[in-house]
Amino acid sequence: MNLFSPFVTAYAVPPPSSEGGMFVLHHLKAIRPYCGFERNLKMLSFLSSLPGAVAQGAIWGIMAVGVFITYKILDLADLTVDGSFGTGGAVLVVCTAGGMNIYLAMLLSLLAGCAAGFVTGVLHTKFGIPAILAGILTQIALYSVNLRIMSGKANQPLSAMKYRKILLVSLRNINKSLIVCGIFVAVIIALLYWFFGTELGHSLRATGCNQAMARANGINTATNKIIGFVVSNGLVALSGGLLAQYQGFADVNMGRGAIVIGLAAIIIGDVVFGKIFKNFALKLLGAVLGGVIYYIVISFVLWLGLPANDLKMLTAAVVALFLGVPYWKGKIAEKRVKPAEEVKADA
């Protein structure tokens, strides 16, 4: 129901008299340009939201790179990220509000995430707890930790007006946010490309590829897993610190569903750029671009009128769909191979 609905309804069912019908038709023609203007205004609002969606997508893309390390390289499901993301935001906001240098606050956010990843790694490797359960345990513990960091408050604001000169990213300055996010993405990908090209990086990749063979070659797989958890959650917390600056507050629940968004970004990047991006650095970039595409799609869906409450359900459906694609492809390939084998057997 909008401003022009009465006119449209009246024209759809005109009054008995021809004069009444002509009157409605005349006014419908008069307001038609305004209907077009309304549509153009909606499209303009969507286009104006794109830079913000790109900036936010890049921030979440950094988080997706962290998830990429455990999910793709170590072949482990780590649910710590839902907690460590909020930890990074909480540490950043509290430190910045306390007068700390913003770069030092970002570093502390990263280290807090590394500590969370270390705990998960120890629970998994030293206590024999499955990775997914170890991540859940750490995530639950981090909820209380995040509340303590924010002095028992569920939400801690960070005024963009008061700290506008020191914040690296902010909703009030999208252009600066895009540049800063681009720099962070480039530096992180460059550092990870270098790291995974070292002997330690190769051993970490070997651990995720084939643990038994890695152990046979004298690689300490337990230590490598801990390192992977540490690096992954450090990047996730760094992303949380950037998002806290961008939105102007830290919330104890800001990381809820982060793992799903991270998986969505990785899968979208793999589906869209998988055949083009073969290099390791480009695969990391694909995860970031997947996050950007995800948030552009979210903006478009909201523009179409989908209730914001349904976004989590939509994200879960998209992730489930794309995770099932490889399975379906395998089943189809099996059906094609079997008839070919039967033909050869008959021959």
Model-derived segments and their meaning:
Residues 32-63, 99-104, 166-170, 174, ...:
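Membrane-interfacial amphipathic/re-entrant helices at transmembrane-helix boundaries
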Residues 209-216, 220-223, 282-285, 297-347:
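Cytosolic-side transmembrane-helix boundaries in multi-pass membrane proteins
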